Amino acid sequence: MADSQSGSNVFSLRIVSIDYYMASPIPGYNICYSSFQGSEVNEVPVIRIYGSTPAGQKTCLHIHRALPYLYIPCSEIPLEHHKGVDGSTLALSLELEKALKLKGNAASKRQHIHDCEIVRAKKFYGYHSTEEAFVKIYLSYHPPDVARAASLLLAGAVLGKSLQPYESHIPFILQFLVDYNLYGMGHVHISKMKFRSPVPHHFRPRRFDLDDCPGQRIDEVAITKANSSAAASVSFPVWSLSTIPGQWMWNLSEESDTPLSQSQHRHQHHYRRQSLCELEGDATSSDILNQQFKMYNSLSQAQSDTNMVQSLVAIWEEEYERTGVHDAPIPPDPGKPSAADVLQTMSDYVGFGNMLKEMLNKVELSPPGMKPTAVSSAGPDMHAKPEITDLQALNHMVGTCSEFPASEQLSPLGEKSEEASMENDEYMKTPTDRDTPAQIQDAEALGLFKWFASSQAAEDINSDDEILRETILSPLLPLASINKVLEMASTDYVSQSQKECQDILDSQENLPDFGSSTKRALPSNPDSQNLRTSSDKQSLEIEVASDVPDSSTSNGASENSFRRYRKSDLHTSEVMEYKNRSFSKSNKPSNSVWGPLPFTLTKNLQKDFDSTNASDKLGLTKISSYPMNEMTDNYIVPVKEHQADVCNTIDRNVLAGCSLRDLMRKKRLCHGESPVSQHMKSRKVRDSRHGEKNECTLRCEAKKQGPALSAEFSEFVCGDTPNLSPIDSGNCECNISTESSELHSVDRCSAKETASQNSDEVLRNLSSTTVPFGKDPQTVESGTLVSSNIHVGIEIDSVQKSGREQESTANETDETGRLICLTLSKKPPSLDCLSAGLQDSAHSHEIHAREKQHDEYEGNSNDIPFFPLEDNKEEKKHFFQGTSLGIPLHHLNDGSNLYLLTPAFSPPSVDSVLQWISNDKGDSNIDSEKQPLRDNHNDRGASFTDLASASNVVSVSEHVEQHNNLFVNSESNAYTESEIDLKPKGTFLNLNLQASVSQELSQISGPDGKSGPTPLSQMGFRDPASMGAGQQLTILSIEVHAESRGDLRPDPRFDSVNVIALVVQNDDSFVAEVFVLLFSPDSIDQRNVDGLSGCKLSVFLEERQLFRYFIETLCKWDPDVLLGWDIQGGSIGFLAERAAQLGIRFLNNISRTPSPTTTNNSDNKRKLGNNLLPDPLVANPAQVEEVVIEDEWGRTHASGVHVGGRIVLNAWRLIRGEVKLNMYTIEAVSEAVLRQKVPSIPYKVLTEWFSSGPAGARYRCIEYVIRRANLNLEIMSQLDMINRTSELARVFGIDFFSVLSRGSQYRVESMLLRLAHTQNYLAISPGNQQVASQPAMECVPLVMEPESAFYDDPVIVLDFQSLYPSMIIAYNLCFSTCLGKLAHLKMNTLGVSSYSLDLDVLQDLNQILQTPNSVMYVPPEVRRGILPRLLEEILSTRIMVKKAMKKLTPSEAVLHRIFNARQLALKLIANVTYGYTAAGFSGRMPCAELADSIVQCGRSTLEKAISFVNANDNWNARVVYGDTDSMFVLLKGRTVKEAFVVGQEIASAITEMNPHPVTLKMEKVYHPCFLLTKKRYVGYSYESPNQREPIFDAKGIETVRRDTCEAVAKTMEQSLRLFFEQKNISKVKSYLYRQWKRILSGRVSLQDFIFAKEVRLGTYSTRDSSLLPPAAIVATKSMKADPRTEPRYAERVPYVVIHGEPGARLVDMVVDPLVLLDVDTPYRLNDLYYINKQIIPALQRVFGLVGADLNQWFLEMPRLTRSSLGQRPLNSKNSHKTRIDYFYLSKHCILCGEVVQESAQLCNRCLQNKSAAAATIVWKTSKLEREMQHLATICRHCGGGDWVVQSGVKCNSLACSVFYERRKVQKELRGLSSIATESELYPKCMAEWF
């Protein structure tokens, strides 16, 4: 085997599905012995992760050594058991073990407790100033034991006292994800693992086929995929027998020649494969690298722009990659009042102060023994250390730093903001670590960090200084070594402190040489051979970052020390990064920050730099290309080390007089200085003695050398310089400065003063002239991250220097340090300059397709070399946002900045140039404007998703605009390579015609000509994880057709499966493969005799053979997601039920981990021949469904079908939460989502089609099933369910299926615990009794009863943005900051738990915030809450997303929809955070006091705003309604525009009254409107003063509700529109008269009168069936005829109300709509019920406010009743005999309705004019026949017609309006044509044919 995979030793796997199982431990690999039990371990939990590697290899990963646990406070253990650490923990554990055994099976030998230890942490529930000791008990072996143990502890079954458990309510899987920093749909990175045999010999790309032919063999070590987001090709490792390291394989393969030991033989079964995945392996929890990169910064020190919630950083980076601009959070307004001041106006602070003083006085006067004190943190003999995340965490915190280059260990040096620099000039002169080089700072920070780790536990453990306590949840050292460790820590503390002080003093002297500093700061590099390889290939990379200290680096524990990567950094090249142990800055987007520097290395480089210690001589940092330029390679700037003098501004006498501790504090303060992110302010540190600035200059001079471009360094100031590749740079001068890293501006708005044309050319050609086009980017990137990455900052310095400052000599250069800054000699233009340049006219100098296109931009390109000029002014405005002086600026989360320097235009590829030249041979005078050259970078996946908006295809868009403004739909080109468009203009017509044809077929209204066509499918969007390479998900859609008997639905007990349609698709592909498995026992020919196209067909003679083949095929494809519309009834559920009848273990066989009895480990294939099939599993057929549906919750809320390792999605139930519809049939959803009409064919017809054979209509049945399988994928893609759910999984940190199946508390808890654990908090786990017995919640939100009326004056709607989250942030409301109520403090309770507060904390009233409900909290200056910080980041992310939405163009409708979904998800998680605190019934950690505080603060804020508005005479406004977070303000006598002005004033004034971030926003203006009752209002809304057409906006009324029918909603909306526009109630009355007459005469569509309501059978009372809801009654009636028609839980069942007997109840008058639509139906729609009980009451609630009486209107209306069905001619008699007209002897005239004799058809009056009567009958019959034929044609075109024309249309879709019209016309035609035929006036017309 290969020793390594391209040097990589990291295995990465995407977490798609995760579960755990119990197994016996693997010797030497798992926990095999328990010291607590004193015996071997029998079973341990093993976590199983399913997913794909970045290369797409399906993998099953077993994680060992992860155990469930819980915590118990040591303070709650009874005192008699305090016999030291060992005694107390042992007694507790033994008692708990005994209780668990007694609770279970006493005779069982099952083990429960594995180990216990003492840890130290803070309680999260309530304010606790000190840490406490906890017993951490590992309940090994069975995770459900944790819940049982918690119940026993709370019940007092252990030690005879109720003990409060902590974190026992967290599920085992979530506990694992949180502890090891893992996220669903993110990657887990493993440092080492063991693969289980067999492994694939070669990598074969996954392909979907039904044969056994092997795929194409690929021998490469890595596969390359195009990444369209980074526009670069990314190489992913492939794991096969030839690439897996030998030590990474279990030595148990049959192919191995190594003899096995006896132990290995005995445990050989442990290493056998369990899964069917391509790869399978084992790893331990300690091998997970993700856990090492948590960020442990204290919240009190983290800046607002530092993302502590790591899952949100990816959203910020994606936006930066898309726009190139980093949108920093908006800082709070310093002029706004403080939280304490606002709370004083809400609360009775005088009474509160008196009560508090009285209580404190009583405490002081009480006897010493009675004085309440804080709960002791530990017993007298207990010694504990701060807890960290695992046993080696202390080593991780220090040791891991030594594994990586020093430049990656220490924090990136941030930059001070302009404001901060101006406000505090002295800070610029303060002696800080900015004056020292990075290597000295590295050593200082590392030493300081070691001092914290060693000394803090012994000395500062009880301090409340959050700067000192950064250590996080971890087990402690054994007791025997505690004293020794403390002694060593004390010694280390003294030595480290002395070394720190010496370093501080040394920093004021001359810097040591580079070699010595390197040896001290950098560890030995184990990968030096990789460095040598990279230097040989001349592909060393350098990485640029800022060099200014950041606030997050306080305590020396820099952010970069912990967070070396994130998933977004690793998703393209994570293996390469891990391989070299060089992790990029956490907040720096990978491959998208820097443009290439114009330098290359030649072979002479090796002469000056030895490859073995190149890292000691070169400061090299990686530079990645900007997305538009990533096809270029990376460049190196070699700089030799020289010594430099550093400013010495510290008085040595002052330093000498400081104590050791003072020096350390000074050191910490220097690190923790409040650095705000700096935009573009220069920071030049000058020598205080000489006032000079040390600066080194790197000057490049370019010379023309014939036609070729060349350049050379004419002056290289660093002495020995390698020969560099020549570069044409004109007069480009690059200043390299040590201290200056700012952009200086000197106005140069004249084009003549800017860079010359040659220098402009250089800037454009930097990325194309130094590296050949054909160079393999993979070669350049391989092995380059090994080098020591020294962060340098790039500066654009164009200050016009004079004298010594402008001249840079070699002597000055020799004194500079190793940290350098690259500076361009010519500054970019300012914004003013750019604006002026945009107005200049274009001047063409030469034919240059990338440079001179007047259609692309205006102005002189030499004026602005950094940016292309666009015509779109709006785009220019957006492009310059967040930039300073024209340079894109990226604000990192740590406060530092990155400057984005890219060429103005990306160069074309070689193929593009060659094709351009070849096409240009015919005409040498082609105008470049008419022949635009498009980029064709195949190697970087460049593409343009919108050709109409692409500036370099203007000739196309201009021509298209001339033809009906139709734009070119380029969605098909979005993921293909671009082409050069050099066709003559005549060809554009064809392109235009194709676009118009595609729009006609899209069934979507065409664009208005102002924007491109909106893509119909969401497949045009891919989220960051699936960009280019995809998320490696395989989705399989399954639909089934089975036989049916008569009108019954298929029953798996009796009916065989005939057709299985399989549609499989990878998420990175737009092409779905279709396969059909056909059971046809009569088929002799196995060929595709049905003539099906676009699919692969397999025919089977036996049903068992069909199932066997289906199982084999599914296991070969190994899909991640199984999808079906109705899983339980028509997809996998039906197959499982049928397989159970056949004796096949279907669900077990299709799982990824089947039972060993059905898996052949030798070839990993299923062997399910008929001889291996066991007897039927179910003896009683009635129990079949119970076998398939495993749990009740799954049946009612998900699919109910569980397949191990695969996600089963019930499509209709997912859509139910996405789209609001009356019915959720696939036909209704397809029309609403896809705008496609889909036929609904009854099972009886499908069976007839299939039975007709290949010569008949069997193909119609097969196509119908295939279409439904395809629709599943299309609907999911249209709604982007897979990608959106994946994104939510990454944000929430939970697995994919939990996003869909778990509630909001689970989501909040995942995000909350991750942040809480970084601050050393433990969450309480209350029991059900505790939750029920907590104090009742007293506060309710303010919901005013509105002044119900019609308002003809403007009504302003003002809304507090995210009111409850804003309250939490503004007033620091959190579990960890809550001090409780004074009244409750006497009872020592807080929420669900007991709480004793140290009253010394209450001494200072200024340090306490009291909310209006008298609950006390500490201000953020004392402690920053977890909830406020979490919500602050969520809201800032949402604001950023909403801003991005506003900047999108109309053609980016798909992206707009995704952004909208993203911001709604963030809004949801922010709003439900309050619900997490207030979940009083099923809450996992509720707190009544906290919930009441949030509600009452919000209520008080709203009440205060209402009073303020009503009391302000200037506005003359009055609040007429208020609801939780909004208020409606009436402005009498104002116009809409005036209302907007007043509304903005109100919003601004109230916003200024409240602390940050409470914001009142003006939403809209209603004019006019109705206010009905609470939460019910409707009106015409205006969202801007310039809006002309109002929007009909309603809430809570029938127009938006689904508990009524469409007739009510349509009638009400039209009536309201008439009244709003006409202001005349008579118009409404006339309209209603017309509608009522239509209803009474029957001239309506039945579709508008269908009710559809949810049915939950099994939840209703069984005492009286008449008490069931109408929909349930209809369902039960249907089930009596066919039990398989049982509706799914919460399925919406349609019904209509018909006429019944006199006095009949409503439950007796409801029927299925299909019953009423039947041609021979005896029923008639109950028109009076709909008018009197539905339409009139709804409208009366509205128009009653203006004095209308609709009941009186209806009574006064001339009553026109239609003739009964008995008076209408029918072809057949009333066979049902359910009406009295069956017994009538008389009939009615078919023309006038008069009574006639039984044998006559016409009355005497009509017979007097026979010709007129005959003409009338013929005309009516002909008209109906034409209508019927037209409707039937529509239905046949849709696919609803029968294969025999005479059989008519078989579709009966209730979602189709054509179906209702067709049935209505069919009834009329049937009766009239029979009479016309009998009268011999018209030929016979068969209505059944239609």
Swiss-Prot record:
Instruction: Tell me the protein's name.
Output: DNA polymerase zeta catalytic subunit
Q: EC?
A: 2.7.7.7
Q: What's this protein's family per the entry?
A: Belongs to the DNA polymerase type-B family.
The Gene Ontology biological process annotation of the record reads: cellular response to UV-C; DNA damage response; DNA replication; translesion synthesis
- On whether Nucleotide-binding is a keyword of this UniProt record, the answer is no
- Gene name of the encoded protein: REV3
Q: Which cofactor does it need?
A: [4Fe-4S] cluster
- Residue ranges annotated as motif CysB motif: 1835-1856
What are its GO cellular component terms?
A: nucleus; zeta DNA polymerase complex
SUPFAM superfamilies for the chain:
DNA/RNA polymerases, Ribonuclease H-like
What organism does the record attribute this protein to?
Arabidopsis thaliana
